[in-house]
């Protein structure tokens, strides 16, 4: 899976989970500051990403994922 494919899938999941237009979701979008996610939204988003990509995102790692790009980099590293 290429970085672009991961980005598209992450953007789609973020758009759906946070109820924002897909055009608003960019690689540098911050989940809380730009997309209005609260802490519960963030937990649900992490769970959705884990399920969609069949990976585990430890709590420590999840705390470091603040933007769409951060999520893509983490997933890319996990999927190797």
UniProtKB/Swiss-Prot annotation:
Modified residues (O-(pantetheine 4'-phosphoryl)serine): 39
Pathway: Lipid metabolism; fatty acid biosynthesis
Alphabetical list of InterPro entries matching this protein: ACP, ACP-like_sf, PP-bd_ACP, Ppantetheine_attach_site
UniProt KW keywords: Cytoplasm, Fatty acid biosynthesis, Fatty acid metabolism, Lipid biosynthesis, Lipid metabolism, Phosphopantetheine, Phosphoprotein
Domain of life of the organism encoding this protein: Bacteria
GO biological process: lipid A biosynthetic process
GO CC, one annotated term: membrane
GO molecular function, one term: acyl carrier activity
Stretches assigned to the Carrier domain: 1-79
Chief place where the protein resides: cytoplasm
Keyword Glycoprotein: no
Coiled coil: none
Modifications after synthesis and translation: 4'-phosphopantetheine is transferred from CoA to a specific serine of apo-ACP by AcpS. This modification is essential for activity because fatty acids are bound in thioester linkage to the sulfhydryl of the prosthetic group.
Record Gene3D superfamilies: ACP-like
PROSITE patterns to which the protein is assigned, alphabetical: CARRIER (PS50075), PHOSPHOPANTETHEINE (PS00012)
Compartments where found: Cytoplasm
Stored Pfam families: PP-binding (PF00550)
Protein task: Carrier of the growing fatty acid chain in fatty acid biosynthesis.
Family classification: Belongs to the acyl carrier protein (ACP) family.
Name by which UniProt lists this protein: Acyl carrier protein
Organism of this sequence: Prochlorococcus marinus (strain MIT 9515)
């Amino acid at each position: 899976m290429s970085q672009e494919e991961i980005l598209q899938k992450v953007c789609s999941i973020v758009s759906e989970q946070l109820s924002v237009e897909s055009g608003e979701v960019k690689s540098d979008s911050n989940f809380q500051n730009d997309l209005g996610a609260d802490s519960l939204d963030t937990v649900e988003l992490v769970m959705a990403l884990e399920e969609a990509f069949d990976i585990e995102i430890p709590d420590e790692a999840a705390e470091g994922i603040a933007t769409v790009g951060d999520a893509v980099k983490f997933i890319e590293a996990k999927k190797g």
